[in-house]
């Protein structure tokens, strides 16, 4: 089962993308594989014009379709998730997240933007028909810091939320995998019994 790490930040480097990478590292430690997609690397004209014929857009949509779970990270600007992420989500089919697990992550300047995930992003994600949207993880700029010497540093409460979110995602993926229908195997005709 593949997990897609979807970075919705228009800039690089980005706190939200670094938080997303950290979640990816935690998932690898639990034995999961992931693919990465940075929306800012897609052609802007194609996204804004909803050009589904663009090769990069087709490949990106295919990556979303093939994933069992999507971890979406975005910065919060003016009490909403990034516009480039919204433009990309608008390209997905009506039920583009069907049967997928979704873990939303966001970073913002202050705690006052914390509800942006629940009031702005979650309804859009829910409209795409995911199997389950896990509890969101929001961190302020002060809670997610970066330096060349020490790399990414998370405040203890955020580190705990990330551990919990990754554990929930991993457990949910395992449950989905166990519940998935197994492939049928051929049965020799001599073993088939029919009654009339």
Q: What is each of the regions a protein language model found here?
A:
Residues 7, 38, 136-138:
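Residue-level recognition of beta-strand->loop/alpha-helix junctions
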């Amino acid at each position: 089962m593949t997990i897609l790490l979807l970075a919705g930040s228009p800039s690089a480097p980005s706190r939200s993308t670094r938080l997303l990478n950290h979640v990816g590292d935690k998932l690898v430690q639990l034995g999961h594989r992931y693919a990465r997609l940075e929306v800012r690397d897609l052609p802007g004209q194609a996204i804004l014009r909803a050009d589904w014929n663009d090769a990069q857009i087709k490949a990106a949509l295919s990556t979303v379709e093939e994933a069992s779970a999507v971890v979406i990270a975005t910065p919060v600007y003016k009490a909403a998730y990034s516009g480039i992420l919204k433009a990309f989500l608008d390209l997905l089919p009506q039920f583009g997240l069907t049967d997928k697990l979704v873990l939303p992550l966001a970073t913002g300047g202050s705690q006052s933007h914390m509800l942006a995930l629940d009031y702005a992003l979650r309804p859009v994600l829910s409209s795409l028909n995911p199997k389950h949207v896990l509890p969101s993880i929001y961190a302020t700029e002060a809670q997610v810091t970066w330096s060349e010497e020490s790399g990414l540093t998370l405040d203890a409460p955020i580190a705990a939320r990330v551990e919990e979110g990754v554990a929930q995602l991993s457990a949910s993926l395992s449950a989905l995998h166990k519940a998935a229908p197994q492939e049928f195997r051929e049965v020799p005709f001599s073993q088939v019994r029919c009654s009339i």
